[in-house]
Amino acid sequence: MSIIKNPTESALKKPHLNLAIIGHVDHGKSTLTGRLLLETGYVDEKAFAELEAEAKKLGKEDFKYAWIMDRLKEERERGVTIEAMHVGFETPKYFFTIIDLPGHRDFVKNMIVGASQADAALLVVSARPGEFESGVGPQGQTREHLFLAWTLGIRNLIVAVNKMDVVNYDQKRYEQIKGELSKILKILRYDVNKVPFIPVSAVRGDNIKVKSSNMPWYNGPVLLEALDAIEPPPRPIDKPLRLPIQDVFSITGAGTVITGRVESGVVKVGDTIVALPPAKVGDVRSIETHHMKLEEAKAGDNVGINVRGFERQDLKRGDVVGHLNNPPTVAEEIVARIAVLEHPTTIGVGYTPVMHVHTATVPTQIIELISRLDPATGQTVEQKPQFIKRGDVAMVRLKPLKPVVVERFSDLPALGRFSLRDMGRTVAAGQIIEIKPAKVEIKR
């Protein structure tokens, strides 16, 4: 039995939003996530009572909420349920799916795949002295995660200033953190007036569901209210079907199941679909979300699709599904506008980082530096520069060294924005302006 309850039918009828929970290690992402699930009634009471007793016995009572997530991770690793990849909770208005649960080995890589599907991000920062500072420092993940969230198109951002109990609910500390983060957010072009900064304690439950009496100085929304007030992003239902594959499973008695989020268009039971780059064709047998069978899935839905004609070994994460009469675009070359976030020296032609685009990762070479742009205006300041460096914005021509599906950012942002990573850091982020398509033969 899973520690997490499955959503009810009425919950699944609410509009769906994907929530990425981001922030520096040890700032309390897991504890806050566990607390959110508990407060919204999505944790099995009996299983949680066992965790509580265990935590008490070990003198680690404060760990019980984070342990909800650990237990879930164990369930996943044992392969308990296929849809355990999507854990959710509901507010009066929405059903939220928490994507990319905290605590994976290569967190930033997973964060990119997860955030590329997110409608909103919850940034968790610790108020504990030293912890906040290391998160926004040069090696800190707070800054990097925020940059990635912006680049990946997440405009709905909520900041939870966590561990307020550790600083005795000090308003000055909260204001200081809010001030420093606001500076970073302004540089990234977030509208700071639209970003709620909520002082919380995940361990004590302050300002999660009900207003805390420990912080009478705070007059804003509690966390669940702020989540409920998110503006849903537009769903490109009228565009061609594009579904980047997150995972491929082979299920005994059922066949091949692909999971992922429909980024555009609609897919119905009985449709003939194609997965590219491998150019495999199949028919949709059934569609499921959170244990519920659907006749169709549309942009914004997280689904598992059982496909006749697909074999597990033919497909992988990062392949993209579309309809046979309007297949996804495999790129031979890409023209993109990139912003260099971090690089120790300079970047020239021949540089080959790894591109992360939707759920795909592919080594990609810069084959031409077309121009350097003014970051503020976007105007060209130099044609054919010899090199680009940290802080520069440039138009570049890229060649993926393995086949990959992308779309122009102007056509479909979810498949048109990417980041470039190298040496474990995010070097640059960009948007795809033009594509030279590769020749692909699709055989039925």
Swiss-Prot record:
| Residue ranges of the region described as G2 | 79-83
What are the protein's GO molecular function terms?
A: GTP binding; GTPase activity; translation elongation factor activity
The record, for InterPro entries, names: EFTu-like_2, EFTU-type, GTP-eEF1A_C, P-loop_NTPase, Small_GTP-bd, T_Tr_GTP-bd_dom, TRAFAC_GTPase_members, Transl_B-barrel_sf
Q: What is its main location?
A: cytoplasm
**G5 as annotated region, ranges:** 201-203
What reaction gets catalysed by this protein?
A: GTP + H2O = GDP + phosphate + H(+)
UniProt family annotation: Belongs to the TRAFAC class translation factor GTPase superfamily. Classic translation factor GTPase family. EF-Tu/EF-1A subfamily.
Q: What is this protein called?
A: Elongation factor 1-alpha
